[in-house]
Amino acid sequence: DTDELKVAFAFLLSMPGAPFIYYGDEIGMRYVEGLTSVEGGYGRTGSRTPMQWDDSLSAGFSAARKDKYYIALDESADRPNAKTQSEQEDSLRSEVKRLIAFRKANPALQSKGEISFVSDDYPLVYKRTSAEQEITVIINPGADAVTVPNVNGKVLYTVGGSAVVEKGIVKADGCTAVFVG
């Protein structure tokens, strides 16, 4: 589900350290069952298909005939591709780009920002802090709305549904990530 992937990227891009996005993750390339391993990936072979650049027959990756491909492509008619997603404001690729820009603009979310977990209850709530700022991150991948008490600040960014802060309580829709600072 694309909405869940967006929330997962919010989690990934709000963690300390250098985030790692493997090619195709940003467009939601899928695992393709039953591909022959050509590079010893075996269990990962289905996640190593060529990049899907566009919606052409060969996904913009090759001009070769299908029987000459070194690694098979995702043959699905609805396979995601970079060109289409770059044209859609609500696509996974567009959200990932916005999240990267948000991370770069906020020192607390960058590699050296500290992390502290608020509790071990659901939803996942943690604080990212730097000398310049503190951001509370709420990750709610579930379908139900949640409330989180004792959060100060205003909503800086949301992924998925909507969220509000009222009197120190965050109310967030299901399948939503919220950044409050």
Report each predicted region and the residues it spans.
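Short, surface-exposed secondary-structure junctions/capping segments
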Residues: 62-63, 69, 157-161, 169-172
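C-terminal beta-strand-rich structural cap/linker in extracellular carbohydrate-active enzymes
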Residues: 165-181
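Loop/helix patches that line or flank the sugar-binding groove of alpha-linked glycan CAZymes
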Residues: 1-135, 141-145
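Short amphipathic beta-strand/extended segments with alternating polar/hydrophobic composition
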Residues: 136-140, 149, 166-169
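Flexible, charged surface loops at secondary-structure boundaries
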Residues: 129-131, 150-151, 171-172
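Beta-strand-rich binding/interaction modules
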Residues: 144-161
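Short, exposed beta-strand/loop patches in secreted or surface proteins that constitute
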Residues: 115-117, 127, 162-165, 169-170
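Ordered hydrophobic segments in well-structured contexts
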Residues: 123-125, 135-139, 157-158, 175-180
